[in-house]
Amino acid sequence: MLSNLKNRVRAHLINYKGWSTKRKIVVFESDDWGAIRLPDITKIEEYRKRYPYPKNPYLKYDSLASEEDLNVLFSLISDCKDNFGNHPKLTFNTVVANPDFKKIKESGFKQYYYEPFTETLKRFSNHSQSFNLWKNAIDEKLMYPQFHGREHVNVPLWLEELRNGNQELLDAFDLGTWSVPENKSSIINLQASLDWIKEQPFTYHKDFLEEGLKEFVEFIDGSRESIMDKVIFMEGERDGIPVEVAMRYNTSYTE
């Protein structure tokens, strides 16, 4: 309770120091672009047989945007303009990597491996050209990518559960996902990439940010974008990590 209150106060203080305006602005911002949640369409029916009535809407609809999805979305945005001739621009809060399930399994769930989300897109049905549509939308100022995280799974917790024989997570793993309606063996949400599990190594959080931002900078051809607030709120000795990484990758960063 006290920790949550502390984080809320810190968030408000950070926002108070930020930019403000009296203009009425509509912000189009959407999370988790690039991250898998549901399996590829080739395995989705098996997944839905296993979990036929999930209460969580993300387990019904949350998946990578296909070429058809993106074409419809960007076509809709292109048809809309303000009185200055500007299109709406969507902020894609981007997750830059997904687990490499094959390599993780080969290691006996002892080592974590990831692949850039652009490689994931190539493997998913009807997604091979999706990233080209991203790049076109960036060039046409229909979309603006922003770093949201390396991957959207709590890696230390997930691997520990797999090594301990959590059958539900092992079954989901074979379908190419970690998402199950409820992981009853832990109070930590598997989606919460940076939540604590026992004593996580100091290097895990630093690697998460360093490697994630490196992938992000590479995929947007060297641009420098902002870090999402989800990686800012850490306690104790880890407080310096976001500052260090932000200064390295965001040329406009100020304390």
Predicted regions and their residues:
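Catalytic alpha-helical scaffold of carbohydrate-active enzymes acting on polysaccharides/glycoconjugates
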Residues: L2-E255
